[in-house]
Curated annotation (Swiss-Prot):
InterPro entries: SF3b5/RDS3-10, Splicing_factor_3B_subunit_5. GO terms for cellular component: cytosol; nucleus; precatalytic spliceosome; U2 snRNP. This is Uncharacterized protein C211.05. One of its GO terms (biological process) is mRNA splicing, via spliceosome. Belongs to the SF3B5 family.
Length: 85
């Protein structure tokens, strides 16, 4: 029983620290947005990954970085309509 409570406490601590971990009320759309933003920020934050993408796309690194930062605003498109009235 103590292990279960300890695991639950650790999960709650992770959820408080990292938004992308989600919780029981996280929607699929929110989870996807968090994953996409995390991936995009990782590429922007690691120069070798950014250089690799720039080479693959055939564009300057500055342009690829700008495009990735713009994509972080709405990485998965507009949110789905809510069912709340």
């Amino acid at each position: 029983m103590a292990d279960r409570l300890r695991s639950q406490a650790k999960l709650e601590q992770l959820q408080a620290r990292y938004v992308g971990v989600g919780n029981a009320f996280t929607t699929k759309y929110e989870w996807m947005v968090n994953q996409h933003r995390d991936t995009l920020s990782s590429v922007v934050g690691h120069p070798p990954l950014l250089a690799y993408m720039a080479t693959a796309l055939g564009e300057p690194r500055v342009q690829v970085r700008k495009n990735l930062l713009e994509k972080m605003i709405m990485p998965c498109g507009p949110p789905p309509p809510s069912n709340q009235f």
